[in-house]
Amino acid sequence: MKKFQELLDKKKYQVFIMSSPVPFPLNYGIHLWFVINFKGTIHRIEFGRFNGSPHENGIGLLKDFLPATKGMNMCFFRKNPRFSSKVEDFIEGHKNSNAFKLATFVLEHHKDYPLKNEYKLLGPNSNSFVGWVLKQFPEITMNISFRAVGLNYFK
C-alpha cells in the first residue's frame, strides 16, 4: 500500500483507515482511526483513551486531537518517540459515492457511537469504533489487519 501523502487527492472525497502499533508492551495490537479528506479538508476522527483528552478519564471520541498521520507513542508513559502510521485501506470517490457517504457519516455522526464512554483492552476500543462505523455500510469492504483487536466487537 502506498503512503498517505502519495494517495491523498484533494479533488476527491477519501476515507483512510490508518493504523499504528499500540504502546509497548502491547504493541502486537494496532490502534485504528479515520482520516477524512473532504476535497482538501483533512480531519482525524478516532476513539480511545488518551492522556490530555478533554473527556472524563481520557476516554472518548476525538476530532483532530493529533495530526492526521501521527502514530501512537511507543511507551505508555512517554509522548515520544512515536510509532509511524500506515494506511490499512482507503476508499475514494466523488459526490454521492460510497466514499462521500462514508466521509459524511464519520464527520456528522461519529458522536452517535453507542459506546463512547466505554473502553476496554479487548473491546470496546478504538478498533470497535471503526468496526461500528463500517457496519453502517455493509456495501463497503475494507481490508484491515487481524491485529486490530476489537474490530469485530459489534458482529
Predicted regions and their residues:
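Non-catalytic ligand/cofactor/substrate-binding and regulatory segments of enzyme domains
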Residues: 1-122, 154-155
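Active-site nucleophilic cysteine motif
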Residues: 29-31, 117-138, 142-150
